[in-house]
Design a protein with these regions (language model features):
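Intrinsically disordered, low-complexity linear regions
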Residues: 71, 78, 82, 133-135, ...
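Bacterial N-terminal signal peptides that target proteins for export
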Residues: 2-18
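Boundary at the C-terminal end of the N-terminal hydrophobic targeting segment
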Residues: 31-35
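Short beta-strand edge/turn micro-motifs at domain boundaries
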Residues: 154-183
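C-terminal segment of classical bacterial N-terminal signal peptides
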Residues: 21-30
Length: 184
């Protein structure tokens, strides 16, 4: 797959985000998700705790940061679903080779973007505020990100956590001040 095609696939994220989220949101009753609210809250809290601890380490190189971020992404995020969702309808028609190449490129871009912002975590803290269910598979864990240095104002954040039957909960999206990671 040529780089031009991969760039087009990235641009499709904006057009497919609404449809997929609507499917998740309206996928049924809230009973199952309600049973897993504490699991979703724990997932977000555990991720925040790990990020805070890692950000305080002074012995980390860029390579170390990327490796740790890769492990965190694998543990806490539904990377496969995010990757498929970011491509939208083109995922179904892509060959296995194209899917594999896109998944590698998507992960590379995701980790590089996260690594570029990693140093800013030292001054941030997460204050949980609310948790809501949307349908029977989606849980929104909300909170405020506070910048202890005072350089930036507080921002509202929602972690969109998917709770599928017989699967561990995983983060599917992060929404900061009503801007979705998947819409960006």
């Amino acid at each position: 797959m040529k780089l031009v095609h991969l760039k087009k696939l990235f641009s499709i994220v904006k057009t497919t985000t609404c449809a997929a989220i609507m499917l998740l949101v309206y996928a049924g009753g809230a009973a199952y998700a309600n049973d897993r609210v504490s699991e979703a809250e724990h997932l977000v809290t555990a991720l925040i705790t790990e990020l805070e601890q890692i950000s305080l380490r002074d012995d980390m190189t860029d390579k170390d940061n990327k490796q740790v971020l890769d492990q965190l992404v694998e543990s806490y995020f539904d990377v496969d679903a995010i990757t498929r969702f970011s491509v939208g309808r083109y995922w179904r028609v892509a060959t296995e080779s194209e899917r594999s190449e896109y998944a590698k490129l998507f992960r590379f871009v995701l980790l590089n973007q996260a690594n570029e912002q990693f140093h800013k975590l030292r001054d941030l803290e997460f204050k949980p505020t609310t948790t809501n269910t949307k349908g029977d598979k989606l849980i929104l864990v909300g909170g405020i990100i506070h910048d202890k240095s005072g350089e930036f104002p507080d921002v509202e954040i929602f972690w969109r956590v998917v709770a599928l039957p017989d699967m561990p909960v995983k983060i599917f999206d992060i929404e900061v001040e009503n801007i979705s990671m998947l819409k960006f």
